[in-house]
């Protein structure tokens, strides 16, 4: 077992006694990105793993892209051919003492939270990257570590890709089940008719189509209010678009604003209400509310939907999920701009009027089926997380020398 010493750097920990450490600016050259000015076929990258457009300018590969800002800045990318990067990512070239692929693997395990700028959006400065300490084995050992990790990670990545694919298949299965049941019902084979609505297709011949607004009351939430109008106003918690998803309502701390007594009566969420997102990327998303310890209200990015009589709110929730996932909301809201699924648009959504008892049967059936599929998805996601953590821990062990390699195992 090799002798180890404390590196003096928190994220690195112990390193072999023959290794040293060095600041990144002595090992690599870090360059800013910029917006391209010409058209062409060169892929353009930001902080994400995929190019999002092409241009005429280029930088030569190989290079490593590291994030400047954004939720994925902690995920480095190795680019082997010509590329261009915009200002949400830095590109890195190696100096003579450092192997670029070894830097790529080090960047997987940097302590980003220690170096991040304290802003709303996660961000890293060029100076922070340049002043970061790196473990410095011999160039030969860097090659060996990078080559070993290439071989190991390619196998792990294959498992990760297969697991992600299985999760997507389960999600597709869930949507297929929802679509089939909310449009065809659960009472076996029966004559069908064309609904004349692209998003719905065929429905049972004896079942009419109506509009949501004829069967449900819809209340749009309150505009933001940053100050009380008089002494009767109180500061209350409210749901906003970020709180409402098909998976349910978020349990985190809620934002607050001022409500009058009349507004509290109008906008208070009740057990069993359907909350629907009015605007933004999640437009059309919805969830059924449950009782809370304290009253919670709605802001105007949310609508409360309640049955006028016999129509089932749980059935409507599944119908809306079906339509959202099939792209209906994108079309009626013109996704080219910021989508707004307004109260009028929700009221005009096609509503398949199954009998009261069949709506209940559909909701019960989908609750059971979706819960089973969701459990499988959760299990696969847990496995995915375990494998990702295993991969990261292996990378860390190798790049910091805690796990050794034979230096005869060299990269090409």
What are these regions (language model features)?
Residues 1-12, 136-190, 352-412:
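Amphipathic alpha-helical coiled-coil/heptad-repeat segments
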Residues 2-46, 139, 143, 194-223, ...:
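Non-catalytic DNA-recognition/assembly elements of restriction-modification systems
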Residues 4-7, 83-89, 120-143, 295-303, ...:
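A short glycine-rich beta-alpha junction/loop motif
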Residues 6-9, 22-61, 75-80, 84-87, ...:
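Sequence-specific dsDNA recognition surfaces
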Residues 37-42, 118-121, 190-195, 225-233, ...:
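Short coil/turn segments at secondary-structure boundaries
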Residues 46-110, 117-120, 124-130, 240-241, ...:
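A short beta-sheet element
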Residues 129, 182, 244, 249, ...:
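Hydrophobic pocket-lining residues within nucleotide cofactor-binding pockets
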Residues 325-329:
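Periplasmic-binding protein-like
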């Amino acid at each position: 077992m090799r002798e180890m010493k404390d590196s003096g750097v928190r994220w690195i920990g112990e390193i072999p006694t023959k290794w040293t450490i060095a600041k990144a600016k002595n090992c690599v050259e870090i360059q800013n990105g910029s917006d391209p000015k010409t058209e062409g076929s060169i892929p353009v990258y930001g902080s994400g793993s995929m190019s999002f457009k092409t241009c005429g300018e280029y930088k030569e590969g190989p290079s490593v892209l590291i994030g400047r800002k954004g939720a994925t800045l902690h995920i480095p990318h190795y680019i082997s051919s010509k590329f261009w990067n915009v200002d949400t990512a830095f590109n890195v070239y190696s100096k003579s003492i450092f192997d670029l692929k070894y830097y790529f693997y080090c960047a997987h395990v940097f302590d980003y939270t220690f170096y991040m700028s304290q802003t709303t959006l996660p961000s890293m400065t060029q100076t922070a990257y340049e002043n970061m300490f790196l473990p410095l084995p011999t160039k030969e050992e860097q090659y060996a570590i990078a080559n070993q990790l290439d071989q190991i990670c390619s196998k792990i990545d294959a498992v990760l890709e297969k697991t992600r694919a299985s999760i997507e298949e389960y999600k597709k299965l869930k949507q297929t089940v929802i679509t089939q049941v909310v449009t065809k019902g659960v009472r076996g084979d029966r004559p069908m008719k064309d609904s004349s609505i692209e998003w719905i297709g065929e429905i049972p011949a004896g079942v009419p189509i109506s509009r949501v607004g004829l069967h449900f009351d819809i209340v749009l939430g309150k505009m933001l209010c940053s100050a009380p109008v008089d002494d009767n106003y109180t500061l209350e918690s409210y749901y906003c678009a970020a709180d409402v998803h098909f998976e349910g309502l978020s349990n985190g701390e809620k934002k607050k604003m001022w409500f009058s007594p009349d507004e509290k009566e109008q906008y208070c969420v009740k057990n069993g209400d359907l909350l629907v997102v009015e605007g933004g990327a999640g437009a059309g998303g919805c969830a059924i509310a449950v009782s809370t310890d304290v009253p919670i209200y709605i802001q105007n990015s949310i609508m409360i939907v309640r049955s006028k009589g016999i129509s089932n709110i749980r059935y409507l929730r599944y119908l809306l999920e079906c339509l959202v996932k099939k792209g209906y909301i994108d079309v009626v809201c013109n996704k080219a701009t910021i989508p707004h699924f307004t109260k009028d648009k929700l009221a005009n959504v096609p509503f398949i009027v199954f009998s009261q008892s069949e709506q209940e049967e559909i909701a019960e059936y989908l609750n059971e089926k979706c819960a089973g599929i969701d459990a499988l998805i959760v299990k696969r996601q847990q496995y995915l997380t375990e494998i990702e953590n295993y991969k990261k821990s292996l990378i860390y062990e190798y790049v910091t020398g805690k796990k050794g390699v034979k230096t005869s195992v060299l990269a090409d």
